[in-house]
Amino acid sequence: MDDRSSKKRKLKDVNGAKASGAATDVTVKPKKLKKAQSQEEVEPKVEKGSKKEEEENDWSDEEENEAADDAGHSSDSDVDEGDDTIAAPAKEADGDIPGDLTLPTTAESEAQAFSELNLSENTMKAIEEMGFTKMTEIQRRGIPPLLAGKDVLGAAKTGSGKTLAFLIPAVEMLRSLKFKPRNGTGVIVVSPTRELALQIFGVARDLMKHHSQTYGIVIGGANRRAEAEKLSKGVNLLIATPGRLLDHLQNTPFVFKNLRSLVIDEADRILEIGFEDEMRQIIKILPKERQSMLFSATQTTKVEDLARVSLRPGPLYLNVDEEKEYSTVEGLEQGYVVCEADKRFILLFSFLQKMKKKKIIVFFSSCNSVKYYAELLNYIDCQVLDLHGKQKQQKRTNTFFEFCNADRGTLICTDVAARGLDIPAVDWIVQFDPPDDPRDYIHRVGRTARGTNKKGRSLMFLLPSEVGFLTYLKQARVPVVEFDFPTKSIKNVQSQLEKLIGKNYYLNSSAKDGFRSYLHAYASHSLRSVFDINKLDLAKVAKSFGFATPPRVDIQLGASMSKDKKAGGRRAYGSQPRQGGTYGKRR
């Protein structure tokens, strides 16, 4: 971007970061900021901390929620305080590349190494320090058009290296336009989950180590006041979750009128978890003259609708998976085991005991199931970490990084950890509760065998009534084989488990919550032909939670089965199951 002909681009001064009496105008219409403060107030100097300080402070919540404490990583020594004009290349970041431009796609015409991209010295230095030399396919095909200002709609498997694919062009753009804190936010990256946002923030921190531009993060559960303070000082590259970003756009006086680039990562997941309205509002508030990048593992109708409103006409479409034989990464050995519901827990317990020296992630379908099984396993000296959406952000952050830094151990979690997270050296992915569909399966197993020539294994538990799910996996090009577990290797701890749950009030209460949530999750499965709640054997399911007889729990089937048009009544399931132990018909 350096060697293009120069052209002047005016970036308006962010003079009113703390505009008095005009909060509404500042948020929705930043152009109405008044120059009420001195240059020094507008563009405060933010000290650049040591690497050790960054590691200790960046990720803690109340203090790191001051996760924007590191967000102010800025050097203002080269600021010309009287100059608001920023030099830009002739082809601007939101430039006028024709929508029908055909870019070369053959391997011969693509750069293979980062050093061939003509990146800035500071960016190249950071990439080398991060240990990267060769580009992945999404990086080879995505970075050059993004550097040229093209809008991109990308489809790539998790673990494909897309984080660097969108961060490198963003950082180069900020450097090229000489963004300073007073210019406000030039790049926004939207992520579906807090953990993924923290991970992207970590990559951005490493990539921007030698640049003077500022970076920060705003996520739900973090200290909102600390975030607002950092934003008011000027955050050039902002990573955010949708809900908290919309909150700040509407209620925090900060400058985003100079936005040049919007990145929407894991767009399908953002929409799946219910942020469609927030995303539409965010796009409506942000400046229209910008470059946009949208990445999604699957191209659903909703994703296409979001792409239509967020991208300019004629975006470049990149699909690095279309020619692959399988939908999952190479080096991943995938298997399943078919067992009755009452044998599920003892099989899982035996597996974890046998694999104590491995690094394992176990997926469950609900927060309460994760909570219960974590309490149970830790109580019986099978140490595990747990991660789910009901935890406070501080706990989630600490757990995530503790597991990332561990050489071995077990993390049990909900799908909050299934998307995008780059956890090093995971040996096994265990899907104790089945995924909602093949897409979720692919994202779950994507936590292992990440990177070039990496190996990993996955294991999925299926009930005999659920084997039809294998047909859907085959249609989705997912190769799985049946694993066999010798009976002699299984530790039969069922009777001890039932005694423990019978006498321990705390575990008993937690088990009931887990049992109820499991039924709710099962009732809400999208593949009803495979995961039919009426085929569940209640007595056997209860045994997997440690109950000798099913507890009496009330669930609202109508609420769970939102896709069913019929009104579902409230009914109790419990100590007197119908003949055969099944649910029978819903009322």
From Swiss-Prot:
CDD domains: DEADc_DDX18, SF2_C_DEAD. One of its GO terms (biological process) is maturation of SSU-rRNA from tricistronic rRNA transcript (SSU-rRNA, 5.8S rRNA, LSU-rRNA). A motif (Q motif) lies at residues 112-140. It is found in: Nucleus, Nucleolus. Gene3D superfamilies: P-loop containing nucleotide triphosphate hydrolases. Keywords: ATP-binding, Helicase, Hydrolase, Nucleotide-binding, Nucleus, Ribosome biogenesis, RNA-binding, rRNA processing. Residues 1-103, 558-587 are annotated as: Disordered. Its main location: nucleus. Coiled coil: none annotated. Its EC number is 3.6.4.13. Residues 331-501 form the Helicase C-terminal domain. SMART domains: DEXDc, DUF4217, HELICc. GO terms for molecular function: ATP binding; ATP hydrolysis activity; identical protein binding; RNA binding; RNA helicase activity. It catalyses: ATP + H2O = ADP + phosphate + H(+). InterPro entries: DDX18/Has1_DEADc, DEAD/DEAH_box_helicase_dom, Helicase_ATP-bd, Helicase_C-like, P-loop_NTPase, RNA-helicase_DEAD-box_CS, RNA_helicase_DEAD_Q_motif, SPB4-like_CTE. Pfam families: CTE_SPB4, DEAD, Helicase_C. Residues 55-69 have a biased composition (Acidic residues). ATP binds at residues 156-163. A motif (DEAD box) lies at residues 265-268. One of its GO terms (cellular component) is nuclear envelope. Residues 1-11 have a biased composition (Basic residues). The Q motif is unique to and characteristic of the DEAD box family of RNA helicases and controls ATP binding and hydrolysis. Associates in the nucleolus with the 60S and pre-60S ribosomal subunits. Belongs to the DEAD box helicase family. DDX18/HAS1 subfamily. This is ATP-dependent RNA helicase HAS1. The gene is HAS1.
